[in-house]
Amino acid sequence: MIITIDGPSGTGKSTIAKALATELNFNYCNTGAMYRTLAYTHLQEPWQALPIKELIDNPPFSFSFISGQPLEAFLEGQLLSAELGTQEVANAASKLSQLPEVRSFMHKLQRKYAELGNCVFEGRDMGSKVFPDADVKIFLTASAEVRASRRLKDLPENSLSKEALHAELVKRDEADSQRLHDPLIIPEGAIILDSSDLTISQVLEKILALVSPNLP
């Protein structure tokens, strides 16, 4: 069974998808972390000067695809975690994700991960492009102001003001929805959930009610 959760940044996709996978005992794939791994790698020496095509043809990074364990990212064997959470990496990932060769590379990896069976995928084009035949498709949304407040809590103190982060989110929304290849759209057949005024538990409860009739 494949469940996809798409939506813009700050809607709670990662938190919800991870909690849902835990509740259902499904595998969880944070596809945003995959793009951020590439972006982080490209920001480091000696890979900074490499063309992206060369970097993805011979990637120094890798991902763990192990059933029952969350996807983990490694750079030359070293586990990446907090390094992927900076705004610099997020901005770089947004730019790289517009490249068709990058999206094709990532889509192949994501479909490979799906071979584990019973997966929750979260991202921006999971239900529209990568898994259009997913069993359940969710599109999470929230106001830009609420999303900025949420993202601010995840960033180091004083790294960005709420106003600056709000502007970054609006800019990211435009880039994601207007990009030529696989833009952020509401997938056909997806159920739209506005999480602006809902807690994580409330959103999870709603999704579980939608998923339960489809469980194997």
From Swiss-Prot:
Cited CDD domains: CMPK
Record keyword Transferase present: yes
Is Cell division given among the entry's keywords?
Answer: no
Which Pfam family, just one, is annotated for this protein?
A: Cytidylate_kin
EC numbers on record: 2.7.4.25
Its principal location?
Answer: cytoplasm
Quickly give the catalysed reaction.
Answer: CMP + ATP = CDP + ADP; dCMP + ATP = dCDP + ADP
- Give the protein family: Belongs to the cytidylate kinase family. Type 1 subfamily.
Stated name of the protein: Cytidylate kinase
**Which species is the source of this protein?**
Chlamydia caviae (strain ATCC VR-813 / DSM 19441 / 03DC25 / GPIC)
